[in-house]
Amino acid sequence: GRFVPVSPTPAAELPDAEFPMVLITGRVLEHWHTGTMTRRSFVLDALDPEPWCGMHPDDLARVGVASGERVALETRRGRIKLEARADEGVAPGSVFMAFCYHEAAANLLTQPKLDPFGKIPEFKFCALRVEPA
């Protein structure tokens, strides 16, 4: 193989005044992929049974909620409510959410625009606003 240079392209949707934060979706240790297998395991589901999002403590304070309280996450496509947890590992201005919880389905919020070459949806990055629930 060989390396081929590419030019980075911006995300289909960037933060703005109305939706000033970034939603990042991903996996958590206890629940792999969409949780279809791991959420059936009573032991694993007991470790992380409820939907949650991770936010930097400064962002939680700016929104006016404490770790463990509920927030509403809203994008141009949808709105869900879930617990917010303080996480200094999440960059300020970003919100991390696992996509394994059907009760608060992350893809109700995500950007469906397809990459022009790979035809992969842009599920990992979209503009978001957070409010107390």
Range-by-range predicted roles:
Residues 1-43:
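Long, low-complexity segments enriched in small/aliphatic residues
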Residues 18, 34, 39-54, 58-133:
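Long, contiguous, secondary-structure-rich segments that constitute the structural scaffold
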